[in-house]
A protein has these predicted regions:
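Active-site-proximal beta-alpha core segment in soluble small-molecule metabolic enzymes
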Residues: 1-144, 158-161
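Active-site loop ensemble at the mouth of alpha/beta enzyme cores that anchors a bound cofactor
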Residues: 155-181
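Polyanion-binding loop/helix "lid" in catalytic or ligand-binding cores
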Residues: 147-152
Length: 181
């Protein structure tokens, strides 16, 4: 499945994946562009593979920052710092976001920090406005590219500022499914 998806999507700016094996497969297929691990790393040794394969990865808890601080690398990594703006699955609490950014920014193992969140209600009545407001309140003074929009935000709120961010993450829509179902 991944090889077929790659052939169909090879004009994409990047790919976001859940596991290191998928990232290795895309590199083996010849993809040299950005690869983002959406759940980040789970073990210290995962960072070695991130370095070797030039992977970007999400940082959503303190343990991942601790692992990065112990990582021995000659090539600093790009990370996506994730804020929990309402999904309540992964990410730093809004009040802890700047502190996490400061810790990451001080690490020589990190060369670029992008900022992200995930819209829990993009497919519902409440939309993205409340979560976008929380995200902006706690990140507006931080530098870095932004990634906020998921499939539901892209389809239901195409003119929203969040959709016009640097990176969007269509997921379920790539399979032809509506995020409403």
């Amino acid at each position: 499945g991944l090889a077929r998806a790659y052939e169909a999507l090879r004009a994409a700016d990047g790919f976001a994946l859940l596991d290191l094996n998928e990232a290795q497969t895309l590199r083996d297929l010849g993809w040299r562009g950005p690869l983002l691990l959406l759940e980040g790393v789970f073990e210290q040794r995962d960072l070695e593979l991130c370095s070797r394969l030039d992977l970007w990865h999400v940082v959503h808890h303190e343990g991942q920052i601790d692992m990065l601080s112990r990582h021995k690398t000659q090539v600093p990594q790009r990370v996506f710092l994730k804020m929990n703006s309402g999904m309540n699955r992964l990410g730093f609490a809004p009040q802890a976001f700047k502190s996490a950014w400061t810790r990451l920014n001080a690490l020589p193992q990190v060369d670029e920090i992008s900022l992200m969140t995930h819209f829990a209600n993009a497919d519902g009545e409440s939309g993205v406005a409340a979560q976008q407001q929380v995200f902006e309140q706690f990140s507006s003074d931080l530098p870095g590219e932004r990634s906020l929009a998921n499939s539901a935000a892209l389809l239901r709120h195409p003119a929203a500022e969040a959709v016009l961010a640097d990176w969007v993450r269509p997921g379920i829509a790539l399979y032809g499914s509506s995020p409403d179902h």
